[in-house]
From Swiss-Prot:
EC assignment: 7.1.1.-
Lineage: Bacteria, Pseudomonadati, Pseudomonadota, Gammaproteobacteria, Enterobacterales
UniProt key word Cell inner membrane: yes
Protein name from the UniProt record: NADH-quinone oxidoreductase subunit H
Signal peptide as annotated in the record: none
Coiled-coil intervals, chain numbering: none
GO biological process: aerobic respiration
Subunit annotation: NDH-1 is composed of 13 different subunits. Subunits NuoA, H, J, K, L, M, N constitute the membrane sector of the complex.
Predominant place of localization: membrane
PROSITE patterns per the UniProt record, alphabetical: COMPLEX1_ND1_1, COMPLEX1_ND1_2
Enzyme class at the top of the EC tree: translocase
Transmembrane regions: 11-31, 50-69, 81-101, 114-134, 154-174, 186-206, 237-257, 265-285, 304-324
Family: Belongs to the complex I subunit 1 family.
Gene name per UniProt: nuoH
GO molecular function terms attached to this record: NADH dehydrogenase activity; oxidoreductase activity, acting on NAD(P)H, quinone or similar compound as acceptor; quinone binding
Length: 325
């Protein structure tokens, strides 16, 4: 058939890759919510969800059905358009952040030359979703949570971006695939250890995960910026948070731990195992650390993380200039 051209086949394969990878990311985010509840129960010497299915295996399905049939209520005093758009923007921006992550040599949705900048741009877009949700709800607790989230995310995105500049300088490219190929013999976590530490801290803060979950602090803000949300709108925020964890874990693997590189096993398996390890670390951090005060979080970022990233950049620049001579 003459209408089947190589360009059409390439487009269809790209669409197939995008659908498969994005479905896997959404599924991983959903299953992580169940795994987190089970592991937190184990860490705290109690039972997790164990009533639906064998060992609670169908709890995720039950939660999805319950959330789907809940009333999609919009407060009368809210801005309906922005209130509805906020969870969609949050979910979409976090999902698109994964599009530039190469899971194997031939599997990447968008192999952009500005991959890192695109990821940072999507992380910045998620801030607007939180701000829209808090402001449009017309609720004082929602607005306070949104203001906290905006200030925290914008601050820690500075450290997130600066921590990656050392990796970019070493690889000589913003392209994720080039960065992974540059780690074929030595992972970036060794020469860029301080950059990795700062990126890990900033990644947890940008995801609003414990101990940086002040925007959702139940004891202070009654669940923060999504207090007025219910039904699938709340579900988009909920699943989006776990997709953010999957994305940050995948970025850690790609930028600092060699991506798909590893012996014996297929590249995709190595990438999945490394990503799963960092997803487990998110859960362990939640079970282990207390929540600090909000002023302590901001002070830690500007007084500890920022100097650490600047020192890392100066050392990286000095080493690169010394090697060039």
């Amino acid at each position: 058939m003459s209408w089947i051209t190589p360009d059409l086949i390439e487009i269809l394969l790209s669409i197939l890759k995008a659908v498969v990878i994005l479905l896997v990311v959404v599924t991983c985010g959903a299953f992580m919510s169940f795994g987190e509840r089970r592991l937190l129960g184990l860490f705290q010497n109690r039972y997790g969800p164990n009533r639906v299915g064998w060992g609670g295996s169908l709890q995720l399905v039950a939660d999805m059905i319950k959330m789907f049939f809940k009333e999609d209520w919009i407060p009368k005093f809210s801005d309906r358009v922005i209130f509805t758009l906020a969870p969609m923007i949050a979910f979409t921006s976090l999902l698109l952040s994964f599009a530039i992550v190469p899971v194997s040599p031939n599997w990447v949705v968008a192999d952009l030359n500005i991959g890192i900048l695109f990821s940072l741009m999507m992380a910045g877009l998620a801030v607007y979703a939180v701000l829209f949700a808090g402001w449009s709800s017309n609720n004082k607790y929602s607005l306070l949570g949104a203001m906290r989230a905006s200030a925290q995310t914008v601050s820690y995105e500075v450290f997130l971006g600066l921590s990656l500049m050392g990796v970019v300088a070493q690889a000589g490219s913003f392209n994720m695939t080039d960065i992974v190929n540059n780690q074929a013999h030595l992972w970036n976590v060794i020469p860029q250890f301080f950059g990795f530490v700062t990126f890990a801290i900033a990644g947890v803060a940008v995801c609003h995960r414990h101990p940086f979950d002040q925007p959702e602090a139940e004891q202070e803000l009654a669940d923060g910026y999504h207090i007025e949300y219910s039904g699938m709108k709340f579900g988009l925020f909920f699943v989006g948070e776990y997709i953010g964890i999957v994305t940050v874990s995948a970025l850690m693997v790609t930028l600092f731990f060699g991506g798909w590189h590893g012996p014996f096993l297929p590249p995709f398996v190595w990438f999945a195992l490394k990503t799963a390890f960092f997803m487990m670390m998110f859960i362990l951090i939640r079970a282990s650390l207390p929540r600090p005060r909000y002023d302590q979080v901001m002070s830690f970022g500007w007084k500890v993380c920022l100097p650490l990233t600047l020192i890392n950049l100066l050392v990286t620049a000095a080493v690169i200039l010394w090697q060039a001579q």
